[in-house]
A protein has these predicted regions:
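Glycine- (often His-adjacent) and acidic-residue-rich active-site loop
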Residues: 1-16
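Glycine-rich beta-to-alpha active-site loop
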Residues: 16-65
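Acidic, divalent-metal-coordinating active-site segment for phosphoryl/phosphodiester hydrolysis
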Residues: 37, 93-100
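Hydrophobic/aromatic residues within transmembrane alpha-helices
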Residues: 42-44, 101, 120
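Well-ordered beta-strand positions
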Residues: 48, 88, 92-94, 109
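C-terminal long alpha-helix characteristic of the crotonase
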Residues: 51-52, 104-153
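Hydrophobic, secondary-structure "cap" segments at the distal end of domains
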Residues: 73-84
Protein backbone atom coordinates (compact mmCIF):
# COMPACT_ATOMS: atom_id res chain seq x y z
CA UNK A 1 0.00 0.00 0.00
CA UNK A 2 1.05 3.60 -0.55
CA UNK A 3 2.09 6.11 2.13
CA UNK A 4 -1.04 8.09 1.23
CA UNK A 5 -3.32 5.13 1.95
CA UNK A 6 -1.47 4.51 5.22
CA UNK A 7 -1.98 8.15 6.21
CA UNK A 8 -5.68 7.93 5.32
CA UNK A 9 -6.06 4.78 7.42
CA UNK A 10 -4.26 6.35 10.40
CA UNK A 11 -6.35 9.52 10.10
CA UNK A 12 -9.65 7.65 9.95
CA UNK A 13 -8.66 5.51 12.92
CA UNK A 14 -7.58 8.55 14.93
CA UNK A 15 -10.82 10.37 14.12
CA UNK A 16 -12.78 7.31 15.24
CA UNK A 17 -10.90 7.33 18.54
CA UNK A 18 -11.66 11.04 18.96
CA UNK A 19 -15.37 10.41 18.39
CA UNK A 20 -15.36 7.49 20.82
CA UNK A 21 -13.50 9.39 23.54
CA UNK A 22 -15.98 12.28 23.29
CA UNK A 23 -19.13 10.20 22.72
CA UNK A 24 -21.83 11.35 25.16
CA UNK A 25 -22.85 7.86 26.27
CA UNK A 26 -20.63 5.20 27.85
CA UNK A 27 -18.89 2.90 25.40
CA UNK A 28 -18.33 -0.59 26.76
CA UNK A 29 -16.12 -3.08 24.95
CA UNK A 30 -16.25 -6.84 25.46
CA UNK A 31 -12.88 -8.01 24.12
CA UNK A 32 -13.02 -11.75 23.46
CA UNK A 33 -9.39 -12.21 22.43
CA UNK A 34 -6.44 -10.40 20.89
CA UNK A 35 -6.34 -6.61 20.49
CA UNK A 36 -3.31 -5.47 18.50
CA UNK A 37 -2.70 -2.06 16.88
CA UNK A 38 -6.10 -0.44 16.13
CA UNK A 39 -7.80 -3.09 18.27
CA UNK A 40 -5.75 -1.85 21.21
CA UNK A 41 -6.56 1.77 20.31
CA UNK A 42 -10.27 0.88 20.35
CA UNK A 43 -9.80 -0.39 23.90
CA UNK A 44 -8.01 2.84 24.85
CA UNK A 45 -10.84 4.86 23.30
CA UNK A 46 -13.64 3.19 25.27
CA UNK A 47 -15.07 3.93 28.68
CA UNK A 48 -15.09 0.42 30.12
CA UNK A 49 -13.07 -2.49 28.74
CA UNK A 50 -13.72 -6.11 29.68
CA UNK A 51 -11.34 -8.80 28.48
CA UNK A 52 -11.17 -12.53 28.91
CA UNK A 53 -8.71 -14.59 30.90
CA UNK A 54 -6.07 -16.33 28.86
CA UNK A 55 -2.91 -15.88 26.90
CA UNK A 56 -4.24 -13.22 24.57
CA UNK A 57 -2.07 -10.51 23.03
CA UNK A 58 -2.98 -6.89 23.69
CA UNK A 59 -0.84 -3.94 22.70
CA UNK A 60 0.54 -1.49 20.20
CA UNK A 61 2.87 -3.25 17.75
CA UNK A 62 3.49 -0.31 15.40
CA UNK A 63 7.19 0.10 16.23
CA UNK A 64 7.75 -3.66 16.02
CA UNK A 65 6.44 -3.74 12.43
CA UNK A 66 8.53 -0.72 11.40
CA UNK A 67 5.99 2.07 11.75
CA UNK A 68 6.97 5.21 13.61
CA UNK A 69 4.10 5.85 16.02
CA UNK A 70 1.86 8.66 14.79
CA UNK A 71 1.19 11.72 16.96
CA UNK A 72 -2.44 10.81 17.56
CA UNK A 73 -1.47 7.31 18.68
CA UNK A 74 0.95 8.76 21.19
CA UNK A 75 -1.71 11.19 22.44
CA UNK A 76 -4.26 8.41 22.92
CA UNK A 77 -1.74 6.19 24.68
CA UNK A 78 -0.61 9.02 26.99
CA UNK A 79 -4.19 9.74 28.00
CA UNK A 80 -5.10 6.16 28.94
CA UNK A 81 -2.02 4.04 29.67
CA UNK A 82 -0.36 3.85 33.04
CA UNK A 83 2.77 6.02 32.94
CA UNK A 84 4.94 3.06 33.93
CA UNK A 85 3.72 1.15 30.85
CA UNK A 86 3.66 4.03 28.34
CA UNK A 87 7.24 3.68 27.11
CA UNK A 88 7.09 -0.10 27.21
CA UNK A 89 3.96 -0.06 25.09
CA UNK A 90 4.59 2.79 22.64
CA UNK A 91 8.39 2.88 22.27
CA UNK A 92 9.13 -0.81 22.79
CA UNK A 93 5.94 -2.29 21.28
CA UNK A 94 5.62 -4.62 24.27
CA UNK A 95 2.60 -6.88 23.97
CA UNK A 96 0.73 -7.87 27.12
CA UNK A 97 -1.45 -10.76 28.21
CA UNK A 98 -4.93 -10.05 29.59
CA UNK A 99 -3.82 -9.73 33.22
CA UNK A 100 -0.90 -7.44 32.34
CA UNK A 101 -3.22 -5.39 30.12
CA UNK A 102 -5.17 -4.32 33.22
CA UNK A 103 -2.04 -2.95 34.89
CA UNK A 104 -0.98 -1.26 31.66
CA UNK A 105 -4.36 0.43 31.19
CA UNK A 106 -5.77 -1.39 28.17
CA UNK A 107 -8.44 -3.28 30.15
CA UNK A 108 -10.49 -2.55 33.27
CA UNK A 109 -11.45 -6.11 34.09
CA UNK A 110 -10.94 -9.69 32.93
CA UNK A 111 -13.39 -12.53 33.33
CA UNK A 112 -13.64 -16.16 32.21
CA UNK A 113 -14.71 -16.32 28.57
CA UNK A 114 -18.05 -17.87 29.54
CA UNK A 115 -18.88 -14.74 31.59
CA UNK A 116 -17.83 -12.07 29.08
CA UNK A 117 -21.22 -11.11 27.66
CA UNK A 118 -22.99 -11.46 31.01
CA UNK A 119 -20.43 -9.11 32.57
CA UNK A 120 -20.69 -6.64 29.68
CA UNK A 121 -24.48 -6.56 30.06
CA UNK A 122 -24.13 -5.93 33.82
CA UNK A 123 -21.71 -3.05 33.17
CA UNK A 124 -24.10 -1.67 30.53
CA UNK A 125 -27.00 -1.88 32.98
CA UNK A 126 -24.92 -0.09 35.61
CA UNK A 127 -23.96 2.57 33.06
CA UNK A 128 -27.58 3.03 32.00
CA UNK A 129 -28.36 4.29 35.50
CA UNK A 130 -26.00 7.25 35.09
CA UNK A 131 -27.57 10.63 34.49
CA UNK A 132 -26.90 11.07 30.77
CA UNK A 133 -26.32 14.84 30.85
CA UNK A 134 -24.07 14.67 33.89
CA UNK A 135 -22.09 11.76 32.44
CA UNK A 136 -21.55 13.46 29.08
CA UNK A 137 -20.57 16.80 30.64
CA UNK A 138 -18.25 15.17 33.16
CA UNK A 139 -16.60 12.95 30.53
CA UNK A 140 -15.87 15.98 28.35
CA UNK A 141 -14.60 17.98 31.31
CA UNK A 142 -12.28 15.17 32.46
CA UNK A 143 -11.02 14.47 28.94
CA UNK A 144 -10.87 18.04 27.58
CA UNK A 145 -7.07 18.41 27.78
CA UNK A 146 -6.58 15.01 26.15
CA UNK A 147 -9.21 15.66 23.46
CA UNK A 148 -7.60 19.02 22.62
CA UNK A 149 -4.20 17.34 22.39
CA UNK A 150 -5.64 14.57 20.22
CA UNK A 151 -7.25 17.07 17.81
CA UNK A 152 -3.90 18.85 17.42
CA UNK A 153 -2.12 15.51 16.96
CA UNK A 154 -4.52 14.49 14.18
CA UNK A 155 -3.82 17.80 12.42
CA UNK A 156 -0.07 17.28 12.86
CA UNK A 157 -0.33 13.76 11.45
CA UNK A 158 -2.08 15.15 8.36
CA UNK A 159 0.95 17.39 7.79
CA UNK A 160 3.46 14.61 8.45
CA UNK A 161 4.63 11.66 6.43
CA UNK A 162 3.80 8.20 7.72
CA UNK A 163 7.09 6.43 8.30
CA UNK A 164 6.99 2.70 7.63
CA UNK A 165 10.28 0.82 7.36
CA UNK A 166 9.57 -2.76 6.37
Amino acid sequence: KSPESAKELVTKGSELSLRMLSFPQPIIIACSGHAIAKGAFLLLSSDYRIGVEGDFKIGLNEVMIGMTMHHAGIAIAKSRLSEVYLNRSVNNAEIFNSKQAIAAGFLDQIVPESQLMETAVKVAEMSSKLNKKAHAATKLKVRKPHLDTLKKAIELDLLSEISIDS
